[in-house]
């Protein structure tokens, strides 16, 4: 954004010098039968066309990491047994043992688990999409000739709703090895496997919101001739810059992500059983949300209709091939990064504009 402002300031600074140059294209004076400048204001409606892209997730638990289980409920173990393995006899043994331990497996018996699946995964059928939004648009033009102009598209940066799609689950798998004291009971290995629910993005509706700054710059060709044709179609091509700030996450989704942070923290702290039970750890997970800047080509078709030599109506439809990236990080001051999720947001907006302008 700073570079963009610098370019604009520089352009205004050299404009007086250009106006004195002997050139029919760069001048502050009227051209041959046409006005050099125009500005219009009106309604700008943005309709994103992109589809949700799968969210990519990483955690601090690497494949093959071994963690102590700590105290865990027998029912928790039974609910997470690998359904692809025949462990009926083991399940009966666990139930029998739980009868004498009040339903818990204490840390001296639960042993440890070798964990798989949480290092990285793709949450299929999930993603983020930008919602439609309407704002106040401002279009300014400088005409090199009666037919060729340079336009700056701007407006009041709107708050855009980011919609969540799908359900996120963690593909947890592990081999648990019970122990007596410090003696591992390798012959009693327990296969665990389950998709642990993390967040239902559909239930939250709006996952987040952000303020979108999307100035665009175009070279345009206007058909017809000033003073002859009241109705003048035009086409344009240029570049859009997208910058997002004031990002705010849905509190319910943030709570789900903090819970996921506690799960990873529990594993790192030697309480893998508490992770399966979604018990709070001693960590203090916080959630950070970021969105990357992006550039995109933009193309426009539109028209102007002259009321007189100064006032006119304008309408246009533009398309920008715009894609950004959103990063969600869950971290703790002591344990560092616990979970990171990245998602491409295909915005690809169609922009409809209708306004009234003035030439000078």
What are these language model-derived features?
Residues 1-21:
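Gram-negative bacterial Sec-dependent N-terminal signal peptides
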Residues 19-109:
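Outer-membrane beta-barrel biogenesis signature
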Residues 21-36, 147, 224-232, 307-310:
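Short loop/turn motifs that connect adjacent beta-strands in outer-membrane beta-barrel proteins
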Residues 41, 138-146, 215-223, 237-241, ...:
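Residues on the lipid-exposed face of transmembrane beta-strands in outer-membrane beta-barrel proteins
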Residues 43-49, 154-160, 223, 239-245, ...:
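Transmembrane beta-strands of outer-membrane beta-barrel pores
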Residues 52-60, 66-75, 96-132, 158-214, ...:
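Extracellular/periplasm-exposed beta-strand and loop segments of Gram-negative cell-envelope proteins
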Residues 141, 149, 153-165:
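Acidic, polar low-complexity intrinsically disordered regions
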Residues 230, 235-239, 282, 292-294, ...:
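Compact recognition or signaling/catalytic modules
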